[in-house]
Amino acid sequence: MSPHDYADRRSESVTDAVTAMNLEPDRATDTPALNGGSTSLKDDTNGVSRSPSAQNMDVAVKSRSSSQTPVKKEEETSNTADMEEKVGGDITVKQEPGQPPKLTRSSSQKVVARPPQLFSHLRDSTAEARVSFELMDSCTYANKYMGYTEHAMECDCAEEWVSSVSGNILSMPISLYALEPALSKNLACGEDSDCINRATKIECVGDCGCGPDCQNQRFQRKEYAQVAVIKTEKKGFGLRAEADLRPHQFIYEYVGEVINEGQFRRRMRQYDEEGIKHFYFMSLSKGEFVDATKRGNLGRFCNHSCNPNCYVDKWVVGEKLRMGIFAERDIQAGEELVFNYNVDRYGADPQPCYCGEPNCTGFIGGRTQTERATKLSNATIEALGIEDADGWDTAVAKRPRKKKMGEDDEEYVDSVQPKSLEENGVTKVMAALMQCQEKWIAVKLLGRIQRCDDERVRNRVVKMHGYQILNSQLTMWKDDFNVVLQILDILDKFPRLTRNKIIDSKIEVTIQPLTSCGDERVEKRAATLLQVWSTLEVGYRIPRMKRDPNATAQAVNQFERRETIRDQRRRSKSRSRSRSRSIEAPRGPAAQTRGVYGQRNPHHHGPRSFRRQFNPLPTGWFAAESNGRTYYYSARGDTTWTRPTKPAPQPPPPPKESRDKALQDIIDGIMNAKENTPKEKSGTPGTPQVSKPIPVKKEGQEKWRGYSEDKQKKVYENTLFPHIKYVVDKFKHKLPKEDLKRYAKDVAKKLVNSDFKNNRVEDPTKISEKQQKKVKKYCKEFFDKAVLKHRAYEQRKYEKQAKGMDSKVETPQAPSDDEALDVKMSDDEEDKADEKDTPMTAEETQGGTKRKREGGIAEDSNLGEYISSSKRQRSSTPPPLPPISPGDDPQNMDNAKKILRDDIDSRSENNEFTPPPPPPPPPDDEMPSESPETDHAIDQSPSRAEYITDMNKLKSSQPEIEGKV
C-alpha cells in the first residue's frame, strides 16, 4: 500500500474535526502563502487531502485503531490523561478530559534541513520548450506610461578599475579603459559596496559617476545565469541551474507583455476558455501585470515551491520598473530553480502543488488555501519591522500574535508592534517605500521613520535618496492630508546643511502648491518648510562630466598609452594618502660613508657641479662669430668686439601724424569697399552645364553638411593644405622658417575665404585636379613675390648700413588698395577653356574693382589687430641685410618698400622677432688688446666657445630672450 492511500484513509476521519479546531496561541505557527492554503489540507503528493465523502463524519479520535495512527498514553510518562494523535509532520490532535480536541504543534514549524534534490539526470529540453512560446529579449508595454517610475538618482560611488590580468587596482584616464575593456574591469557598485542605488534597488545608468560597466547594471547587460529547461514528472517544464549560484545572484529577468488590470482580467477568462491551465501572470505594480503566457523568456519556466531557493524582486532601471529572479541561498548545479508564488502569481483555478516539501501548503492558488498567512513579501515584512515567529522566539519572551482566519493584512500589521528603526534597517525601509503602491503600507513605513529620533538614522535616510523618495510619495498621496502632514514632519526633522539635495530632488516644486491647498495645517507646515529651505546655502560641487553614449573613443596607440600610464602613476604617487618613507635617524658612523667631508655632515655627496653663469646681452644687442672670435652687433648696424654692457640705442618712434593718416586711409578704403559690395551674388555658372544624375551616397559620407560654416572652412583648409605644402617645400631655402609657416597659413586662409565667398566649394572634403593646379599656381606666385619682397627688404637695409646712414625707419605711408592687398590669384592668367568649364573662373572674370573690394574686406578682419599694434612702442628696428645677389632684379624695390611695412607690422602684432643676420665684423684694429684683467675675467668664466655655442642654441629656441625690445 502506498503512503498516499494511507494518507487518504486517515484524512477522512479527522477532516471535520480539524476544520473546526483552532490552533493554540502559544504553539501555533504558520507558513506564509498566497490566497489561502491550509496546513491541514494537502494534496496526494504530500499527505492529507480533503475527500468529498467526508460530510457526516463525527470526531472519532478514540475509536481510531492503533494501526492507523499511534496514540500516546500519557499515563506512562505523566499523571495527566491527555491524549495526542499525530496528524502529519509536527501537527498533532491533542485531547484533554472534558475538553474538545485541539490542533497543536510540538514546536515551531521549521523546514527540516535536508540535502537539495538534484535533477542533473534529466535531459536539456530548452529547444523543445521554446516552441511553446514566443521568445522576447525585453518587456513590451501596452503604452509608454506602463511600468513608468521616476528616476533621477545618481550614486556617489567612484570608479574602481582593476586589471583583469594581474588583479591590481589601477588609476588611469577612463578613455584608456574604454579602449581596452578586456584588460580592465570596473568594480564600482559591487555587491559588497555601499552603493546607494544598489541598496535601494536602482540600477546605475550612463549619467552616474561610477563610470561605464559598473557592477550595478545586471538588467541592462542581461547578466543571466547559466540555466536549462527540463521536463519534470508532474510540473511540466522547469528551470535548472547549470552552475553553482551564490546568494542574491541575478538569475533571469521575468519578461513578458506589461498590461493593465482590465486586460489582465480579460486574458484570464480568455486563457481559461482556451484550456490553458498554466498561467504566467506576475504583478508588476498596482494595476499593472506582466503576462508571459504566450510571449516571454526562459524565466517563465521557474516553478513554485513552498520552500523556494529563489525570490522575485523589482528593480528600477532607467525610467522603468523591471522584475527579476534572484538566488535566495547557495544553489548547487543541478538544482531546480523555484520561488514562492504566494505574493503576486495569479491563475484561474486553484492548482495543486507538487513541490514535495515538508511545509507544502497543498495548492498554489485558490480559496482552499489558508488565510492565516500574510500575502506580504519577505522584504516588505522586514521593512515594516515584523519578524517571523522563529526570529521572535529568541528576541522576546512572548511570541507575537499570529494572523487570525479571515483577518486582513492591514488589521494584522496594526495589531503587531513593529521594531524601532535602526541604522542598518534604513536601506530596506527606503527600498520598500520607493516601490510601495498601497497607502496603508506607505503610512506604516513613514511612521517608522517619523518615530525615529536617532540622528544617524535620519542622516542615513537622507543619504538613501530620502528627498527623492519622499517627493514621489508626496506626489502619490497628495490628496490625503494626513499622509502629507506625516511626510512634511519627516522633512522638517531632516538635517539641514546645504540645499543641494533639495534642489536635485525638485521637492520644492511639489510642496509649493500645498501652501494653498485649503488645509490650514498643511499650508502652515509647507510654508514654514519652504521658508527654512530658502535660507540654506548651495554648496559648490565640481560639475560631473556628462559622457556621450554615442561618442566613439579615439584610437590610442600602445606607446601613447604607456606614457599616459607612467604620468598617471607619478601623479597618483604624489597624491597618495599613504605616509611617505621617513628619513632614517642617524645610526652612528659607518666606515664606508666616511670621506673627505667627514661623517658629521650628511649633506655632502661629492663636489658641487659647476654651474655656468648666464649673463644675457643687453637689450638690442646680438652675438655672432667671425674666424672663431665673437663680435656683437645691434639692430641698427653697430658692431663691436667688446661685450656691451648697456642697451643698444633705439631709433626714434615714427611720427604719430603719419601713422594716423595711414590708418585713416585704410579705414576709408574698407568703408568704400563695403558700400560697393553687392548684397546678393548669383551662383549660376557662366555656361550652363548638363545635369548629371546624383548618385545615392551612403549615410555618413556627407557629414560635413551638418557642420557650421567655420567647421566646413576648417575641413576645406585641411583639404587644401597638402597642395600648399607641396609648394612651400620648394621655398625652404629662400625664406626664413617662421615667415614660411606664417605665409602658408595666410595663403590657406585667403584661398578658403575666397572660395567660400564666391560659392566655389561644392564638397570641402575634396577638390578637382583643375583646382589643385590653380592652388599650386597661386601659391607659387604668392611665394615668388614673397621672396622678392624679402630680398628687397634685405638689400635696402644693407645699403643703409654700407653708406653709414643714420638708422631711422621711414615713416610708413598709407598704402593704396592695390598695394595693401597681398598677392591675388589672377583670373586673366587662366586658360579660356578653364573659364568655361569651371564655375570658379566664371566668378573671377570680373574686373580689378572686385579684387580691390575683396582686398578691402580682407583687411577688415585684421583692422582691430592693426590698430592695437600701432599703440605698441617699437624699441627695435629691422636689422641690416646681406648684399643682394647679382641675379636679382631691383626694379620692384619701390613696391617692396610698401609691402615691407605691412610685413613689419604683422611681425610686431604676432610678437615675433627673429634675430637679424649679422653684418660684417668690425675691423681688427678695433679689437681690444688682452689685458691681465681680461685674462682674469676669462679664467673665471666658462670657455668662450662653449658660451657662444650656448648662446646660439638659446637664440634658436627662444630668440626673444636676448633680442627682447
From Swiss-Prot:
According to the UniProt entry, which residue ranges have a biased composition of type Pro residues? 646-655
Query: What's the stated role of this polypeptide?
Result: Histone methyltransferase that trimethylates histone H3 'Lys-36' forming H3K36me3. Involved in transcription elongation as well as in transcription repression.
Instruction: Please state every residue range assigned to the domain named WW.
Output: 615-646
Has keyword Methyltransferase? yes
* Primary subcellular site in the record, as a coarse category: nucleus
User: Which residue intervals are annotated with compositional bias (Basic and acidic residues) in the record?
Assistant: 1-13, 696-706, 797-809, 895-910
| Originating species | Aspergillus oryzae (strain ATCC 42149 / RIB 40) (Yellow koji mold)
Q: Which GO terms describe its molecular function?
A: histone H3K36 trimethyltransferase activity
The alphabetized UniProt keywords are:
Chromosome, Methyltransferase, Nucleus, Repressor, S-adenosyl-L-methionine, Transcription, Transcription regulation, Transferase
Annotated AWS domain ranges read 150-223
Taxonomically, what lineage is the organism?
Answer: Eukaryota, Fungi, Dikarya, Ascomycota, Pezizomycotina
Gene Ontology CC terms, in alphabetical order: chromosome; nucleus
According to its UniProt entry, one GO biological process term is:
methylation
Protein name as annotated: Histone-lysine N-methyltransferase, H3 lysine-36 specific
Q: Which stretches make up the Post-SET domain?
A: 349-365
Q: Where is the composition biased (Polar residues)?
A: 36-56
